[in-house]
Each structure stands twice: as structure tokens, then as C-alpha cells.
């Protein structure tokens, strides 16, 4: 059986014509039902003939992730633990904010791998190890779950406004499925997200950077977190295989649109990378590119190997960057009361023994 959510539009068109003997326009109808109307069954596709729906049901399935756990923070952040068809667990987070007009808008943080191979020592997902890549259908299934949860089926005026590939996994190590996902996200007859509303975050893997940039399908964010190679080796051991100097050199020629900048994510770890000497090194790196900095304050949980930086060090770090004409914004952490950081909810479920593969999952 073909999981139809794993097909690009071109693949769906070929499936409909070759496998079902349908005219090409039928693929467009099915495609819009899948991605714009969030259909979970072929029976919902009321402008498709019953005979065609029956043939679709014989040869294809629509597989959404099942919702295992939902947690909502006092600040409105909502975290989902999702079970995939093979029992694997991934997380996605909905982060609310208000527009300038005061209307609600949601940013969704997406996972692209089950686990992660990068082994970053400050990240809960990094301690779990890597299981497998997610498919396009599994990646985009997170968006379908979010839209269903929000009652958001209005492509002309959606509540779900922005998508960030900053959940579990390294996008550039699953480049093929991530790129397939981005094309469907950008498709005006698909999920219809503007590239300006999508950000792909990488630990700094050079391979795939240029392909992502030349595609124009999303903005780029780089999880930097270290001002020099020595600290990078210590806190991001796998990412350190790609030297910082080589990464910055690659970013110097990264294709950017007018007024577009690379966003550098920098997690402030108390006593590790939050000193003025680190800020000086950071300026030397970032000033080589058209970049800006998001400063993230580490929020330790019990048993974590790092401490939060003091307010004084945070302020001094930020002010030094601004004094050197580096745009630096302290990003507010949300969902701290529900373990909204990457991998924390899955880790807590595993510790309780409720997330074993193959366990029964409730309906979404």
C-alpha cells in the first residue's frame, strides 16, 4: 500500500494516471484534499467519484501521526508527542505570539528525524542517539496535526503562520525528505506557506547548505552555540567534525535574497560560552557574514550538565555584541513548565516506560 502523504505532486500525478487510470486533473483534486482540507480518509473527498475513492482505498492509505501526549504551558505553548506508524516517537511544539495588530499567530517547531546523530551535550534529543530519518509524509503530518488541533483550515488567513525546522534531528542529514517537504509546503495548492515563513536550522553541516540556499524554499538558521572550535568540540562533538572556519567560509558565499540574513542561534551556557572573551570571538565570526544573533538563555533541568548564565553576564554579552554593530536579540524561552525544549517530553516518557515501540496509541 502506498502512503499517499509521502508522494510529491508529480509522484501523485503519476500514481493517479498509471496505477488508477485517472485523468491528470484528478491528482490536483486529491492533492488539495490532502493538504488544504486536511482529509484523513478518501471518503471525505466528496468531489471525487465513489469509484475513484474506492480504487484509492484499495491501493493507498493516508497515514497521520497519532497523538500520544499533549501538554499545554501556562504561556500557551503546546507540545505534542506523536507516534509514527512504526511506533517511533517524535515531538512538535506550537508557540503562540501576537501580531502587531494583536491577532494570534502560531509558530510550529518541526522534527525531521527520530532522535539525532549530532550528540549535542546540552540537548535532550542528542542524548537519545539516532534511530532513523523521517519521511516527507511524517514531517508534514506534524503540520496536519497542528492544523487539525487549531481548527485551522483557512489557507487565506491561517493561525499557523510560521514553521521552523528546529525540533528533533538535523535537517541537512535528511536533506532529500526535507527538500521534498519544503516543496510541498511552498506549493500554492499544497500547504501554501511562503518561503519567508519557513526556517531550516542546521548545526553547521556544509553538505547541503548550497542546495538549500539555491532552492529559495526557506530561510537559514545556524545552531552555532560556540565561539571557537575548542568549545564546539566539547559541547557539539559531532558537529565539530565540520570546522567553524570552514562553516563560516561556506556561509560567506551562501545565496541570500535582498535584505535576507543568516540567523545564528547561540545558547548561553553559564561559565562555558557566556564571557566577554567569547563575545569577542563571536564578533569575529559573525561579522564575516550577513548574519544576526538569537541569544538563548539555557534553562537547566534537574541533572543537566550545565548552569544558566547570570543576568549580569547575559546583559554584558548582549551589550558587547551591539557595541560592535552585531544585531543580537535575547530570545524568550517558552513552555518551560511543560519541558518544551527539544526531546524533553520524549525523554520523560521513556523514563516512565510509557513510550515503548509498539505500545497502543490513542486516536488523534
From Swiss-Prot:
Cellular location(s): Cytoplasm
The answer to whether keyword Iron-sulfur applies is yes
EC number from the UniProt entry: 2.1.1.192
GO CC, alphabetical:
cytoplasm
Domain Radical SAM core span(s) in chain numbering: 102-337
Amino-acid positions noted as binding S-adenosyl-L-methionine in the UniProt annotation, renumbered to this chain: 169-170, 201, 223-225, 299
What does the UniProt keyword field contain? 4Fe-4S, Cytoplasm, Disulfide bond, Iron, Iron-sulfur, Metal-binding, Methyltransferase, rRNA processing, S-adenosyl-L-methionine, Transferase, tRNA processing
> Can you quote the record's cofactor note?
Binds 1 [4Fe-4S] cluster. The cluster is coordinated with 3 cysteines and an exchangeable S-adenosyl-L-methionine.
What the entry lists under InterPro entries is as follows: Aldolase_TIM, Methyltransferase_A, RlmN_N, RNA_MTrfase_RlmN, rRNA_lsu_MTrfase_RlmN/Cfr, rSAM
In terms of domain of life, where is this protein from? Answer: Bacteria
Alphabetized GO MF terms: 4 iron, 4 sulfur cluster binding; metal ion binding; rRNA (adenine(2503)-C2-)-methyltransferase activity; rRNA binding; tRNA (adenine(37)-C2)-methyltransferase activity; tRNA binding
Q: Binding positions for [4Fe-4S] cluster?
A: 116, 120, 123
Its GO biological process terms? rRNA base methylation; tRNA methylation
The catalysed reaction is: adenosine(2503) in 23S rRNA + 2 reduced [2Fe-2S]-[ferredoxin] + 2 S-adenosyl-L-methionine = 2-methyladenosine(2503) in 23S rRNA + 5'-deoxyadenosine + L-methionine + 2 oxidized [2Fe-2S]-[ferredoxin] + S-adenosyl-L-homocysteine; adenosine(37) in tRNA + 2 reduced [2Fe-2S]-[ferredoxin] + 2 S-adenosyl-L-methionine = 2-methyladenosine(37) in tRNA + 5'-deoxyadenosine + L-methionine + 2 oxidized [2Fe-2S]-[ferredoxin] + S-adenosyl-L-homocysteine
Which residues are listed as membrane-spanning? none
Query: Which Pfam families does its entry note?
Result: Radical_SAM (PF04055), RlmN_N (PF21016)
Per the annotation, which location comes first and is thus the protein's main one? cytoplasm
Coiled-coil ranges from the UniProt annotation: none
The role this protein plays is: Specifically methylates position 2 of adenine 2503 in 23S rRNA and position 2 of adenine 37 in tRNAs. m2A2503 modification seems to play a crucial role in the proofreading step occurring at the peptidyl transferase center and thus would serve to optimize ribosomal fidelity.
Q: What name does UniProt use for this protein?
A: Dual-specificity RNA methyltransferase RlmN
Q: Which organism is it from?
A: Nitratidesulfovibrio vulgaris (strain ATCC 29579 / DSM 644 / CCUG 34227 / NCIMB 8303 / VKM B-1760 / Hildenborough) (Desulfovibrio vulgaris)
Amino acid at each position: 500500500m502506498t502512503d499517499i502523504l509521502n508522494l510529491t505532486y508529480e509522484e501523485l500525478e503519476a500514481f493517479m494516471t498509471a496505477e488508477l487510470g485517472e485523468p491528470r486533473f484528478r491528482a490536483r483534486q486529491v492533492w488539495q484534499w490532502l493538504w488544504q482540507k486536511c482529509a484523513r480518509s478518501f471518503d471525505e473527498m466528496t468531489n471525487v467519484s465513489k469509484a475513484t475513492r474506492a480504487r484509492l482505498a484499495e491501493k493507498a492509505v493516508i497515514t497521520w501521526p497519532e497523538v500520544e501526549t499533549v501538554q499545554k504551558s501556562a504561556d500557551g505553548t503546546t507540545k505534542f508527542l506523536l507516534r509514527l506508524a512504526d511506533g517511533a516517537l517524535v515531538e512538535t511544539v506550537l508557540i503562540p505570539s501576537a501580531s502587531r495588530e494583536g491577532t494570534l499567530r502560531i509558530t510550529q517547531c518541526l522534527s525531521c528525524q527520530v532522535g539525532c546523530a549530532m550528540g549535542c551535550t546540552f540537548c535532550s534529543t542528542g542524548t537519545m542517539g539516532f534511530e532513523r530519518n523521517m519521511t516527507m509524509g511524517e514531517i508534514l503530518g506534524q503540520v496536519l496535526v497542528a492544523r487539525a488541533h487549531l481548527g485551522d483550515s483557512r489557507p487565506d488567513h491561517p493561525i499557523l503562520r510560521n514553521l521552523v525546522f528546529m525540533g528533533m534531528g538535523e535537517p541537512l542529514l535528511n536533506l532529500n525528505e526535507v527538500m521534498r517537504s519544503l516543496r510541498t509546503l511552498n506549493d500554492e495548492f499544497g500547504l501554501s506557506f511562503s518561503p519567508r515563513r519557513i526556517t531550516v536550522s542546521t548545526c553547521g553541516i556544509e553538505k547541503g547548505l548550497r542546495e538549500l540556499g539555491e532552492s529559495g524554499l526557506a530561510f537559514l538558521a545556524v545552531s552555532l552555540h560556540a565561539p571557537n572550535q575548542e568549545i564546539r568540540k566539547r559541547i557539539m562533538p559531532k558537529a565539530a567534525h565540520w570546522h567553524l572556519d570552514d562553516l563560516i567560509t561556506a556561509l560567506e558565499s551562501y545565496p541570500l535574497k535582498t535584505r535576507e540574513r543568516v540567523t545564528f542561534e547561540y545558547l548561553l551556557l553559564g561559565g562555558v560560552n557566556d564571557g566577554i572573551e567569547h563575545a569577542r570571538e563571536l564578533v569575529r565570526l559573525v561579522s564575516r557574514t550577513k548574519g544576526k544573533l538569537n541569544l538563548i538563555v539555557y534553562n537547566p533541568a534537574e541533572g543537566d550538565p550545565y548552569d544558566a548564565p547570570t543576568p549580569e553576564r547575559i546583559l554584558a554579552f548582549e551589550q558587547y555584541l551591539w557595541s560592535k554593530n552585531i544585531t543580537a536579540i535575547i530570545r524568550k524561552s517558552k513552555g518551560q513548565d511543560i519541558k518544551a525544549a527539544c526531546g524533553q517530553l520524549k525523554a520523560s516518557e521513556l523514563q516512565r516506560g510509557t513510550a515503548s515501540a509498539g505500545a497502543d496509541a490513542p486516536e488523534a
